[in-house]
């Protein structure tokens, strides 16, 4: 029985503080009002910037997952957890969606 509790504890703690995969990070609820004053060219530039930033943050989050997996090996299952990358990715995904909605509502091509 003692070994069972130890195994359950180790299984539980091995899941402790793992970073969230980028595919599971959703976009924040961002109002499109900040993009309403932009013309189509400026909106397009902003969307391109946000897409590039999203890619950078997804790579950073994937690297954090790899580092966390390496750390778990020697730190009794304790990972690095989510950092600033995940919260910024959450915000950037929401901003990109808001900009895309405004872009489509203005019927930009």
Question: What do the PLM-derived regions correspond to, one by one?
Answer:
Residues 25-69:
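Post-signal-peptide N-terminal segment of Sec-exported extracytoplasmic proteins
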Residues 16-19:
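Bacterial signal peptide processing site
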Residues 11-14:
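C-terminal motif of bacterial Sec signal peptides marking the signal peptidase cleavage site
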Residues 1-8:
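Sec-dependent signal peptide recognition
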């Amino acid at each position: 029985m003692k070994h069972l509790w130890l195994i359950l504890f180790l299984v539980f703690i091995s899941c402790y503080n793992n970073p969230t995969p980028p595919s599971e990070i959703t976009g924040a609820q961002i109002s499109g009002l900040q993009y309403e004053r932009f013309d189509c060219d400026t909106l397009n530039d902003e969307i391109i910037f946000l897409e590039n930033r999203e890619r950078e943050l997804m790579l950073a989050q994937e690297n954090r997952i790899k580092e966390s997996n390496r750390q778990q090996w020697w730190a009794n299952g304790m990972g690095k957890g989510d950092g600033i990358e995940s919260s910024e990715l959450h915000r950037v995904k929401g901003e990109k969606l808001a900009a895309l909605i405004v872009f489509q509502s203005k019927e930009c091509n």
